[in-house]
UniProtKB/Swiss-Prot annotation:
It is found in: Nucleus; Chromosome, Telomere. This is CST complex subunit STN1. GO terms for cellular component: chromosome, telomeric region; nucleus. Widely expressed. It comes from Arabidopsis thaliana (Mouse-ear cress). One of its GO terms (molecular function) is DNA binding. Keywords: Chromosome, DNA-binding, Nucleus, Telomere.
């Protein structure tokens, strides 16, 4: 298994994210059709849905190849997961998450980075970073990067 993509955000389009399959050897990794394993992804697309609750922001990103559901947690101040963290760090994380959530508006083009996972049989991204893009070419450039990386990095070559 190729572990070179485990520590990086793989740039993928929605269609590729939806086609990920659970890795048979690791619970938090998913396999691309080419054979490479990923756990973190990056996608750029238009925000098509937005559902804000006190605990999280759930939004949909459509890049033309499909739509991926993204979840950004906003409960850093009340979650027991963060109870052992430094309070200053928790405040910083909570503040950053709230600012990023405010940028996510329907119709905006956004870049989302986070951990990929499956929830009720559907692939989704648990977003660490979600920022609105100001560059009108960002989505097209992301597509071109995905094509190039798909051909050069994400395909596992069998050495004979």
């Amino acid at each position: 298994m190729d572990r070179s993509l485990q520590s990086t955000h793989a740039k993928l389009v929605a269609r590729d994210i939806q086609r990920l399959t659970q890795s048979p050897t690791e619970s938090n990794s998913f396999s691309l059709l080419g054979g490479a394993c990923v756990s973190r992804v990056e996608i750029v697309g238009t925000i098509v849905s937005r559902d804000l609750t006190p605990k999280f922001l759930k939004f949909g990103v459509d890049d033309g190849t499909g739509c991926v559901t993204c979840v950004m947690w906003l409960n850093q101040l009340t979650s027991s997961y963060f109870s052992r963290w430094d309070p200053a760090t928790i405040l910083l994380l909570a503040s950053a998450a709230r600012k990023q959530a405010a940028q996510i508006r329907i119709g905006a083009v956004a870049r989302v980075r986070g951990r990929v996972g499956s929830y009720r049989g559907v692939m989704q991204i648990t977003a660490n970073v979600a920022v609105a893009e100001r560059d009108p070419n960002a989505e097209i450039l992301h597509w071109l990067e995905c094509l190039k990386l798909g051909q050069s990095c994400y395909r596992v070559r069998i050495q004979s």
